[in-house]
Amino acid sequence: MPRTPHLLAIQSHVVFGHAGNAAAVFPMQRIGINVWPLNTVQFSNHTQYGRWTGQVLPPEQIPALVEGIAGIGELGNCDAVLSGYLGSAAQGRAILEVVGRIKQANPRALYLCDPVMGHPEKGCIVAPEVSDFLLEEAAAVADYLCPNQLELDSFCDRQPNSLADCVEMARSLLARGPRAILVKHLNYPGKAGDTFEMLLVAADQVWHLQRPLLAFPRQPVGVGDLTSGLFLSRLLLGDDLRNAFEFTSAAVHEVLLETQARGSYELELVRAQDRIAHPRVRFDAVRL
């Protein structure tokens, strides 16, 4: 019987709704991953509601918790680390310390960094020190980097004028160290308004994918967290880059279809769980 992969997910958590680990953990478990959630912040709800309560985990607690796992002899079983929203740059450095500790215990372990920087229109902006950390430190350590368009622009200090520019920008990030760049949401002049586009760039391959863009009165939160978690999970389950890319897009689309059908603001993960595991429609990635 194949061994079940283990993944340490270090990102935010909300008590109500789905963002950060609350968006990613259950879907990753549903497709066959043992997830170890470590919450960088715990908020009552996501910040787009305009009000919330909660607290940030002190940075020193991150390696302390992981050291506890090492103490029971389980750290070498960790196959991957996923990081997302950070409450501070100090948290980010603590995560890189943990990544190094895990790679020492298991040299084959992967690290996927979702470089969450937020967006002015969505009411979630990380501190400048966090953006600097992601740009200057995290990208050099990550095996996989999963920015959205805003974050790609920040990494490259420019905005694209075409899809070709997006490819060039993602390729430039490979020089910092990652094996591949997954751009979770493309936005560039000339892009069709009725499509949602993604891009996957590695040293020897470039894949572009389109699916229908679904309309919502209020855009659901947590889609990027879901995307990064599913992509890393499929790699751990043995998919190559293209298949992980296509599966992730299809599964996320299934969640959004159910969310739209229910008129929900929060992602309908539970109702869509079977379609997360077995998407009904596959969107073919095109090699560029």
Swiss-Prot record:
GO terms for cellular component: cytosol. Pathway: Cofactor metabolism; pyridoxal 5'-phosphate salvage; pyridoxal 5'-phosphate from pyridoxal: step 1/1. It catalyses: pyridoxal + ATP = pyridoxal 5'-phosphate + ADP + H(+). Substrate binds at residues 12, 47-48, 225. One of its GO terms (molecular function) is pyridoxal kinase activity. GO terms for biological process: pyridoxal 5'-phosphate salvage. Disulfide bonds: none annotated. Belongs to the pyridoxine kinase family. PdxY subfamily. This is Pyridoxal kinase PdxY. It comes from Pseudomonas paraeruginosa (strain DSM 24068 / PA7).
